[in-house]
């Protein structure tokens, strides 16, 4: 299976290519006009692998939650590439992708509590368990104030020990007592296309959707609609 993965949910821009068990990726700080930056990464990955866009099985993307502008742009780029090549899309939770980073050898965690700064005094959070080495949602993704998250997360942590991932633990001092309950803490973890590609390959084409359903998941309601495909910029995706 060949899957291209894209992510713009945080301050980073990343792309990855899963090709029959081999994973290659590109990561960089997101620059102004990062839709074009993402397309350059895609071109580089396809060139390195000797693969044409049309030869892929699907395009995966980080569907959120995360930075609103980045989510919209990632969905728009995904749609444009998928329509151009006649490919389906596979949406992957960015919180799940963060949990996956701590479920990967050499020291894989069995359970991960993800807490990502959502700004405006709130966090995105969810609990995940490892099943056959892949992150599976164990509590519903939510956006909440730190105090509300603590009340709900403590009961989940009582079941078994867990690791913690995400910027929320560092952004809100109120979460320090919760962080102290964790076996280990990785506040610097951000979503990456590598884990999105891995999880999409695990989920398979049964999770694939038509390109028009490449839509962000914000967990907040006060967000503008996805931009038109013209957000790709004047050049758009290269012909394949």
Language-model features: locations:
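N-terminal beta-alpha supersecondary unit
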Residues: 1-65
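Residues at secondary-structure transition points
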Residues: 29-37, 68, 72, 76, ...
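Surface "functional belts" at beta-alpha junctions
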Residues: 33, 88-191, 218, 223, ...
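Phosphate-handling active-site elements
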Residues: 47-54, 82-92, 107-110
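Acyltransferase
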Residues: 184-240
């Amino acid at each position: 299976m060949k899957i291209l993965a894209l992510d713009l949910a945080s301050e980073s821009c990343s792309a990855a290519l899963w090709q029959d068990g081999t994973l290659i990726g590109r990561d960089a700080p997101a620059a102004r006009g990062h839709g074009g930056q993402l397309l350059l990464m895609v071109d580089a990955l396809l060139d390195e692998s000797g693969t044409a866009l049309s030869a892929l099985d699907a395009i995966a993307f980080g569907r959120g939650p995360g930075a609103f502008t980045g989510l919209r742009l990632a969905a728009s780029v995904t749609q444009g590439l998928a329509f151009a090549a006649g490919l389906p899309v596979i949406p992957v939770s960015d919180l799940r992708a963060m949990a996956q980073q701590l479920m990967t050898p050499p020291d894989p965690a069995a359970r991960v509590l993800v807490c990502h700064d959502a700004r405006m005094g709130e966090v995105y959070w969810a609990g995940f368990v490892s099943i056959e080495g892949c992150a599976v949602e164990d509590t519903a993704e939510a956006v909440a104030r730190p105090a509300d998250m603590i009340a709900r997360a403590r009961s989940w942590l009582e079941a078994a020990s867990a690791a913690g991932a995400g910027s929320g633990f560092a952004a809100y001092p109120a979460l320090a007592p919760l962080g102290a309950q964790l076996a280990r803490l990785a506040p610097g973890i951000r979503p990456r296309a590598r884990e999105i590609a891995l999880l999409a390959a695990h989920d398979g084409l049964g999770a694939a959707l038509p390109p028009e359903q490449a839509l962000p998941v914000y967990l907040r309601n006060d967000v503008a609609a996805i931009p038109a495909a013209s957000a790709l910029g004047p050049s758009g995706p290269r012909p394949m």
